């Protein structure tokens, strides 16, 4: 069963994630009668056996991760950690687990429930949490009467997918560079992989995914062309011939010389291999805030305050 659900090279698991991800991004992907009766097939049905809480992409992924582009308050936030440290990665895994089970996202939506949109996301995700934690295991146990079957088919994939997404996100958002105004540079904090080993529907172009999400996966090269000047200027995070899982591990274990030699694409053609390694290592260690300070920020209601400040600025 492990070979069946994970697949060789994790491709079945990756495909299940990819299709659920695409459904979350495309609320009109199915006809109205399908949306009202079955909903998102991979996100809300198949996903129960792949560690995915129903509605997690529709709610948390869209209204936290993409709204904040990985910034403070995101359930996937990681810029309070040293991405070149495997020890810091161990602090990140529980954060992803809290996201996967729905707890952290529910708490974030609840704290911002004054917004009708966020209140709607709270109750939608709450429905998904109840389905995943009560309905799904109840049905499986009712049919099989086997706790072992329940562990292997339902709980184990949750643990595996948690680690998988932690590694993937560790790679996708590993690097931080600030421009002359102190703002994060988009072509650095979300990376692009060219000729990737496991690309599915343009998932490897995470830069386009965040900063031009309307771009269809066959057209991401057009967005790359638009970003070329910035990529050259800031030595953007562009890599080649590597999977995001492999890259995540290479970053985690501080293998920047190997990344520089084999995978980094220097569009400026001005940097030596060692300069690239030093630059990437430095960017992987840049923090927006210290880990303990970020926890204090969360406890003090930083998310709600930031949302109010952003709304006031917009008005």
What function would you assign to each model-found segment?
Residues 170-215, 220-223:
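Cytosolic/matrix-facing juxtamembrane and C-terminal tails of multi-pass cellular membrane proteins
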Residues 2-4, 154-155, 192-193, 199:
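Intrinsically disordered, low-complexity segments enriched in polar/charged residues with Gly/Pro
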Residues 1-151, 218-219, 224-315:
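Non-catalytic, topology-defining segments of multipass membrane proteins
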Residues 65, 151-153, 188, 193-194:
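Extended, compositionally biased low-complexity polar/Lys-Gly-rich tracts
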Residues 8-25, 53-57, 154-182, 202:
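Transmembrane alpha-helical segments that form the membrane-embedded catalytic/substrate-channel core
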Residues 51, 55, 157, 196-197, ...:
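A generic helix-loop boundary/linker signal
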Residues 138-144, 156-160, 196:
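Short, conserved, surface-exposed binding loops centered on an aromatic residue
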């Amino acid at each position: 069963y492990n070979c069946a659900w994970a697949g060789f090279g994790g491709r079945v698991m990756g495909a299940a994630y990819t299709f659920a991800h695409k459904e979350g991004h495309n609320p009109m992907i199915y006809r109205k009668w399908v949306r009202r009766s079955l909903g998102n097939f991979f996100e809300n049905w198949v996903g129960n056996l792949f560690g995915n809480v129903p509605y997690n992409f529709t709610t948390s992924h869209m209204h936290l991760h993409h709204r904040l582009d990985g910034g403070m308050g995101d359930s996937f936030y990681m810029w309070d950690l040293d991405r070149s440290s495997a020890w810091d990665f161990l602090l990140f895994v529980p954060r992803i687990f809290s996201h996967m089970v729905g707890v952290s996202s529910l708490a974030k939506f609840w704290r911002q429930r004054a917004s009708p949109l966020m209140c709607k996301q709270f109750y939608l995700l709450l429905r998904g949490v109840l389905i995943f934690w009560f309905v799904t295991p109840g049905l499986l146990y009712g049919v099989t009467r086997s706790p072992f079957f329940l562990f292997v088919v339902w709980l184990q994939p949750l643990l595996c997918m948690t680690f998988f997404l932690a590694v993937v996100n560790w790679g996708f958002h590993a690097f931080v560079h600030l421009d002359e105004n102190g703002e994060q540079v988009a072509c650095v904090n979300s990376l692009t992989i060219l000729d990737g080993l496991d690309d599915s529907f343009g998932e490897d172009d995470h830069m386009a995914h965040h900063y031009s999400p309307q771009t269809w996966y066959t057209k991401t090269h057009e967005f790359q062309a638009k970003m070329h000047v910035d990529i050259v200027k800031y030595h953007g995070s562009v890599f080649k011939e590597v999977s995001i899982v492999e890259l995540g591990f290479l970053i985690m274990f501080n293998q920047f010389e190997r990344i520089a030699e084999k995978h980094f694409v220097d569009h400026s053609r001005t940097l030596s291999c060692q300069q690239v390694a030093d630059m990437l290592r430095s960017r992987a260690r840049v923090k927006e805030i210290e880990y303990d300070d970020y926890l204090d920020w969360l406890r003090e209601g930083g998310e709600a305050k930031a949302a109010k400040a952003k709304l006031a600025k917009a008005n």
